[in-house]
From Swiss-Prot:
GO terms for cellular component: chloroplast; cytosol; small ribosomal subunit. Keywords: Chloroplast, Plastid, Ribonucleoprotein, Ribosomal protein, RNA-binding, rRNA-binding. GO terms for molecular function: small ribosomal subunit rRNA binding; structural constituent of ribosome. This is Small ribosomal subunit protein bS20c. Binds directly to 16S ribosomal RNA. It holds the Pfam family Ribosomal_S20p. It is found in: Plastid, Chloroplast. Its main location: plastid. GO terms for biological process: translation. Belongs to the bacterial ribosomal protein bS20 family.
Length: 74
């Protein structure tokens, strides 16, 4: 455990951010199975704006979602 006050605060902040990021990512995964296309794309875009995922990964996720759901609807 860190002894410096600012280090202790940074540990707390990074843990809080990690938990928030995990929640957002798991919510996106859940949406990909249960929600509509618009809801999925909106959640992915919000995650990019919050800095949770990189924009290139967001594009890949949207593309993967499109491919999997275009096959299932045919």
């Amino acid at each position: 455990m860190a002894n410096i006050k600012s280090s202790i605060k940074r540990i707390r902040i990074s843990q809080r951010n990690r938990l928030r990021n995990q929640a957002i990512k798991s919510h996106i995964k859940w949406l990909m199975k249960h929600a509509t296309k618009d809801e999925v794309e909106s959640a992915i875009d919000k995650a990019v704006n919050k800095g949770v995922i990189h924009r290139n990964k967001a594009v890949r996720m949207k593309s993967k979602y499109e491919r999997s759901h275009s096959r299932s609807t045919q």
